[in-house]
Amino acid sequence: MDEITTILDSTRPVSDIISDLKEKSVDVPEWSKSLKDYDPSRHKIVTDKFSRKDKIRSDGRVEPASRIHLGLEKLLVKRITEFAFAIPVRRVYHNTEENKKRQQITKAIEAIYKYARIDSENIRRGNAYFASCEIFTIWYVVERPNTLYGFNSKYKLKCKTYSPMDGVRLYPLFDEWGDMIAMSFEYKKKIKDKEVTFFETYTADRHYKWKQQGEASWIAVTDPERIILKKIPGVYAYRPAPIFHGLEHIREEIEYTLSRNSDVIAYNSAPLLKVTGELVGDEDKGEARRLFRLKNGGDIAYVSWTQAIEALKYHVDTLLKLFFMQAQMPDLSFENMKSLGNIGFDARQMILSDAHLKIGDESGAWIEFFERECNVIKEFLKMMNTSWADEIDNIEVEHVITPFIQNDEDALINRCMKGNGGKAIFSQLESIKMAGYSSDPEKSLDQIQKEDKAAQQARINSVFNEGSE
């Protein structure tokens, strides 16, 4: 009897089964700890009462200390996700040449990705993966007759991603060879104003679902559901640390530096009046012309406060540079971008080379994830269209992650034309469609051809008229 069969033995108490399934096979940081760095409102400076003490006035009023918190970790997660997936992942299909059935299958796979909104799903998965360190995407079918995939299908294929960011605890279970034998997850759901905890497990042939009753009692929601795919209908990915690991001390130093300086500015921003000599009488407030009288050549003036701002600016700028340098991500703030001016495509590539290397470093785990996900989709497609079952596995799918860069279309087109011997790389109809201005490109092309023909005829007539004179 294998390990997972032993764990899921129906004669065992459900609480023991779930306890064994919660024995996580991988070491992933607790999201509750990473959240303290990811969420700016949970940073140390927000609750620090030791080094950031509030001032209590003599009248009992509390003057709160400045607490400036920065969401640099959240920004870093968004930025690396955007660099990885702002340009949608491209799929290249091999071994489909001169085989119409395989070409139809590739179109069906692309349609599955399209109607599952995979591009926006990748953005969500990227944010969750780089911040909370693990994701699990489950694929499932809903009964909905359609022709979205190029054939009459009774079902529509959809996907849903779970991660600790959504309050879901993931429990993958691997065997000694590193193959996943079970995937479990625990989540809470409100039912009639009561929060109920559910625990689900997927194996290669069964789907189990339990709900919690009381503190340690569990009951089955339904009988185990058979999985006809003969494999877990989902994919799991994890990383050993969040993308911002080791950078929190830099962000913390920036927060404390700015907060301390904010207190200094607040203290010294009120006008300070300097009086030299003895003041005679009182100055009446509210008068249009204010008069101060002083004895023995006295003087009165406002004292201007001078702050050594350059040292502070240098310190904060250096820390910001260190933060993004160690993260291997560029600081794409508006201030930095406007100083670059109108640089060429090659210069942009050079500037972003470190970020592209970082995406290349991270892409290995993603490519593996996408390949396993594609295999799950293929298995579903075999069931949805049995006439394709013998050909689906013959198609090879290559996933290409393109790091973000602003393209120079003129340079790209000129380079492609040069490689094409100086000839056009788009037909007239294709260029009209790409421009996007015409609501009916075919009609526009027909009109352009008519106008060209009329102009050519006018030139011919002009030549003959000049000759007859």
Question: What are the roles of these predicted feature ranges?
Answer:
Residues S217-M350:
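Extended, charged amphipathic alpha-helical segments
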Residues Q103-I109, G298-Y302, L352:
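A short, surface-exposed helix-loop junction/capping segment
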Residues M1-Y155, F464, S468-E469:
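Extended, helix-rich architectural segments
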Residues L279-D284, R289-G298, A311, T318, ...:
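C-terminal helix-loop subdomains that flank or include functional centers
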Residues K78-A86, A128-I135, H245-D263, K433:
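Short, hydrophobic/amphipathic alpha-helical patches that form generic packing surfaces
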Residues I123-G126, F130-A131, F136-A237:
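Extended, regular secondary-structure scaffolds
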Residues V28, R42, I87, Y115-I123, ...:
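Short secondary-structure junctions and interdomain/linker hinges
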Residues K101-A108, K114-N122, Y129, G246, ...:
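Short amphipathic alpha-helical segments
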